[in-house]
Amino acid sequence: MLFGRLTERAQRVLAHAQEEAIRLNHSNIGTEHLLLGLMKEPEGIAAKVLESFNITEDKVIEEVEKLIGHGQDHVGTLHYTPRAKKVIELSMDEARKLHHNFVGTEHILLGLIRENEGVAARVFANLDLNITKARAQVVKALGNPEMSNKNAQASKSNNTPTLDSLARDLTVIAKDGTLDPVIGRDKEITRVIEVLSRRTKNNPVLIGEPGVGKTAIAEGLAQAIVNNEVPETLKDKRVMSLDMGTVVAGTKYRGEFEERLKKVMEEIQQAGNVILFIDELHTLVGAGGAEGAIDASNILKPALARGELQCIGATTLDEYRKNIEKDAALERRFQPVQVDEPSVVDTVAILKGLRDRYEAHHRINISDEAIEAAVKLSNRYVSDRFLPDKAIDLIDEASSKVRLKSHTTPNNLKEIEQEIEKVKNEKDAAVHAQEFENAANLRDKQTKLEKQYEEAKNEWKNAQNGMSTSLSEEDIAEVIAGWTGIPLTKINETESEKLLSLEDTLHERVIGQKDAVNSISKAVRRARAGLKDPKRPIGSFIFLGPTGVGKTELARALAESMFGDDDAMIRVDMSEFMEKHAVSRLVGAPLGYVGHDDGGQLTEKVRRKPYSVILFDEIEKAHPDVFNILLQVLDDGHLTDTKGRTVDFRNTIIIMTSNVGAQELQDQRFAGFGGSSDGQDYETIRKTMLKELKNSFRPEFLNRVDDIIVFHKLTKEELKEIVTMMVNKLTNRLSEQNINIIVTDKAKDKIAEEGYDPEYGARPLIRAIQKTIEDNLSELILDGNQIEGKKVTVDHDGKEFKYDIAEQTSETKTPSQA
């Protein structure tokens, strides 16, 4: 707040406000304390105006104490509430409108009148202050009819009418104090001033990534001119922001655009004190240049070269390269000023400078911790945008969320409102039916409810005023989690239990394979607890083993446990990348090839879902060169697509599956199943597969993988468990047709026996179930047997499968229990 612009009496009002907050043991200085401060200055215009409406200091004190009362003992620094800050800003705005250089008590009173939601506004309402008359009385006391000189600013610029209609005067806006403060850009503003002070080609162009603060530098220059912090050469200059879209708009006939632009140039040259600011400078190229007519850039070139027209441009690096650099004559008329992305420390300082504006707008308190969290989290997790823009957006949206949450009408008030409406309708119906005694009772009930509603509403409002709404780190984390889908909020008890029991959750779908399940679970817990390396993926794994042991199933189970759906993972079938040129499909087709605009199959999916499980299935099937592209993904957690965009893989789990070495094992008659010495078999499988893996893939690729896991062979007991899982899936499908199927243990053992194949793992079980159960059931259904609503028991008598169809009884188990 600009305390230097306050009169001595207004400064004393703020001091009195602080004293009143201390006297009442309040933790913040609010609008009510400002009002009490005004009453403590009886010689001020504000106090005299209020006294003329029979509002005295004693009455104000009584109302304030009645509305919010005394607080608990408070120790610590007092801060202004967002509403109080808003009042100070409004008072400064009132002073500007009345063309006063300083803010007095009268302006603070006008600010309190305009801010109509605080405790002070309720005090005015309770004391029956006529707001319109009070405002008129203040203006009358000043002897200065409001806005009598409405066009005072326009008189300075009446020699540039066309320019004024097409451009915004940033110096006037800066004088009004409505521009956001510019922090930490002194070096760039100084360089702009140096270029503007040249004799010729005095046209700086601000070049930088979107959102780094290029436009803010032009606004900073306007503020520097207003504050008289510029050299003599730039004093009294006007910075005018010209929008090329506005210049082109409405030019229906040929020559109209050129005439309008020439008129603007003539006015600028005659005025001699205008610096033109063109945001999105690349729009000059081609603007208005249809059917052979010259465009805006060619019209401006002569004046820019001679120094008759001072222009500040702003554009991005890509647009500068595409549009400005290709026109060498235009490029040499502008002097580039590089605007880099600010550091994390500088961004924190920028946000602290903007804090007052956002607190006043959202009427909440923004803590230092929230600002630091916004900068750090946006810098880490929002990789396709730039500071400070993304951090400012994060603070703005989180503040909006907190404000809306705290100002939502509570349920008890809504219930009373609905009850009042209901009673009112019943009363009207009773009157219409001429049941006047009942109507009178309902009227009394309505009055009682309305009184109850007012009391509850006042209690809620008092609680709101007493409670300072603050923006916390957790609010910031919630918003960024909503943006990216990455869970960043504090781990609650339910999620903590879920993470600690992740192994059990995965084992519900994946039978056996403890090593793989444990390794994956540990990686997920490390990431969620915030302990993982921030520059690498959550985890990268190679799953080795013969076919059908659960490698792909584990990836699906992990996706389901993390996202609630096993289709949520990004699956890349490497058998589709058997040719060398197919690698372009991962990151996008090169420039000039068909499909360049479509993006890569992998990069586009990860850009849309940065928090995901990526499965590269059957990696040995792909061309060896395909894996070179994954080197930087595994090491640095990012990949650059063909459009030059960096795609962030730091919040992904990368799983690669392979059957490499399986053929050699088969040749050695070790397929990974059966055998009496399980440990010996597993060691043989492990050594063979790791040896083949090293022969098939380069060491720099394998060295970047977090863990290489060789899956165990499946025992007969595990196969029986898998049969039970598959049968349960079948019963769930049949339950949709109202058929209850029960498969006995003997039948399951026989299915496991028939489906047991040492070469193919668990997949033959699917075929065994189809052959033994599904085929026969389908015949029963199609043969006219009415088995819908009945119980079908599948058993094996030692020779063949038997099917017993019976009516369902109340004791019959549900399909899920079968």
Swiss-Prot record:
Q: Report keywords, A-Z.
A: ATP-binding, Chaperone, Nucleotide-binding, Repeat, Stress response
Report residues binding ATP: 208-215, 545-552
Write out the ranges of the annotated region (Repeat 2): 80-144
| Official protein name in the record | ATP-dependent Clp protease ATP-binding subunit ClpC
Annotated stretches, region: Repeat 1: 6-71
User: Ranges for the UVR domain?
Assistant: 417-452
A GO MF label: ATP binding
Q: Region II: start and end of each range? A: 471-662
Query: What does the UniProt record say this protein does?
Result: Required for growth at high temperatures, probably by acting as a chaperone during heat shock and targeting heat-denatured proteins for degradation by ClpP.
Q: Which CDD domains match?
A: AAA, RecA-like_ClpB_Hsp104-like
The opening ranks of the lineage are: Bacteria, Bacillati, Bacillota, Bacilli, Bacillales
PROSITE patterns reported for this sequence: CLP_R, CLPAB_1, CLPAB_2, UVR
Q: Is the Aminoacyl-tRNA synthetase keyword given for this protein? A: no
GO CC annotation: cytoplasm
Domain Clp R span(s) in chain numbering = 3-144
Q: Which family does the record claim for this protein?
A: Belongs to the ClpA/ClpB family. ClpC subfamily.
- The segment annotated I runs over 163-410
Under InterPro entries, the record lists: AAA+_ATPase (IPR003593), ATPase_AAA_core (IPR003959), Clp_ATPase_C (IPR019489), Clp_N_dom_sf (IPR036628), Clp_R_dom (IPR004176), ClpA/B (IPR001270), ClpA/B_CS1 (IPR018368), ClpA/B_CS2 (IPR028299)
Supply one GO BP term.
cellular response to heat
